[in-house]
A protein has these predicted regions:
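Conserved ABC ATPase "signature" region
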Residues: 84, 91-109, 161
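Catalytic Walker B motif of ABC-type/P-loop ATPase nucleotide-binding domains
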Residues: 138-141
Length: 238
């Protein structure tokens, strides 16, 4: 549970994340989705209860809704500098930065500055920065919210590809029901009333999704199940 002055407490929230799971967290505005990620990342402290993270400190990557890139720095520096500040040598930080940029399709743009990048490319740099810590857990707070549908779809496919290649669990926040059902193996719906998890829905089908899975009846049924749960979560009657 977490308390903010002047508003009702959020939670309690009981959420477990297994190795290599992909979990989507959906809910109305103010339900506590971003707060849940910040608790998992150790950026917030619960008023009661505990957050147990069986991963090493520094092994959690966080992708914020805004790329939050340093405007004066090129893509490589935006990824490498936080690593150097955490104690890595300049050579190792540069190696990880170049490898992470290549992993997100920007291996040919290490010298590009933020103003030279599209919104999708800037988000890829932010993703590369999160991957550069070689995380066991990757947290993504509505990373696609400001992007067009084509760019969003490309980044979703990239996340599936990266997940398949790495031993990483992912938890991401989204308002998009179809996005949640497609990307995740589980969808957790938070109550609009108090932020507790009201539904935890397993998604059918393999991950990564096979080509054409969006046309599968199981996908449509999963989308409807999440949409129904989200609608029910917004019932504010006592």
């Amino acid at each position: 549970m977490i308390d903010y002055p002047g508003r009702a407490p959020l939670g309690p929230l009981d959420l477990s994340v297994g190795p290599r799971e992909i979990i989507a967290v959906v809910g109305a505005s103010g339900a506590g989705k971003s707060t849940a990620l910040r608790l998992l990342a150790g950026l917030e402290r619960p008023a009661s209860g505990a957050v147990v993270r069986p991963v090493e400190p520094g092994r959690t990557g966080f992708v914020f809704q805004s790329p939050t890139l340093m405007p004066w720095a090129d893509a490589r520096t935006n990824v490498a500098l936080p690593l150097e500040l955490s104690g890595l040598s300049a050579a190792e930080a540069r190696r990880r930065a170049d490898a992470s940029l290549a992993a997100v399709g920007l291996g040919d743009r290490p010298s590009a500055r933020p103003h030279q990048l599209s919104g999708g490319m800037a988000m890829r740099v932010s993703l590369a920065r999160a991957l550069s810590v070689e995380p066991d857990l990757l947290l993504l707070d509505e990373p696609f919210a400001a992007l067009d549908s084509i760019t969003r779809r490309g980044l979703i496919e990239d996340l599936h590809r990266l997940w398949a290649a790495r031993s990483v669990a992912m938890v991401f926040v989204t308002h998009d029901v179809e996005e949640a059902a497609y990307l995740a193996g589980r969808v957790v719906v938070l109550s609009a009333v108090d932020g507790r998890a009201v539904t935890d829905i397993p998604m059918p089908g393999p991950l990564p999704r096979p080509e054409g899975w969006r046309r599968d009846a199981a996908y449509r049924e999963a989308v409807e199940a999440v949409a129904d749960a989200l609608g029910s979560s917004m019932d504010r009657t006592p």
